[in-house]
Amino acid sequence: MEIKILHLVEGAKNAKGLTVVIDVFRAFSLAAYAFGAGAKKILPVADVDTALMLKEKNPHYLVVGEKKKQKVPGFDFGNSPSHILKADLTDKTIVHTTSAGTRGLVSAMHADEIITGSFVNASAIIEYIKMKKPPLVSLVCMGYAASIPVEEDTFCAD
């Protein structure tokens, strides 16, 4: 099994094989907690306009995320796991957009399969990779705003 560690949006664009897009502190920790709170589905999108358009077409969807570290007006929740810890998300569909993590998911067009990575789901990722035994794994560290590498994402990949 070959493992490549890539960085930022350019890394996501070059990712192949089983791809783990890593955004430790916010996006994918929030995603893990959202599923833990009963969310049925998370739809990652690259930008605020797409998120709001999906909400307009599907008023029962919840919109979660941030732009420049701030909750966007009209969104149901920001991008911190603490924003959803007490929320009942049972059977909810969440539209999620962030400055880093969801942009990586959308950019990983050449991946065979894409999963999200964070410390909160690291053991599940390891078990999944062991089970799948892919010939190539790409670990994509999304960094701060998908433009500056950060230690926590790199540590998670290591």
Task: Write out the residue ranges for each language-model feature.
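A short acidic-Thr-Gly-centered motif at the start of a beta-strand
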Residues: 4-14
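Domain-level signal for Mg2+-assisted phosphodiester chemistry and nucleotide/NA-binding surfaces
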Residues: 37-42
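Short acidic, Gly/Ser-rich segments with clustered Asp/Glu that frequently serve as metal-coordination loops
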Residues: 11-12, 19-31
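A glycine-biased structural micro-motif
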Residues: 16-17, 91
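Acidic/Gly/His-enriched mid-domain segments of enzyme catalytic cores or analogous surface patches
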Residues: 43-132
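Conserved beta-strand elements of the Class I
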Residues: 18-20, 62, 138
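Active-site rim beta-loop-alpha module in soluble metabolic enzymes
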Residues: 136-158
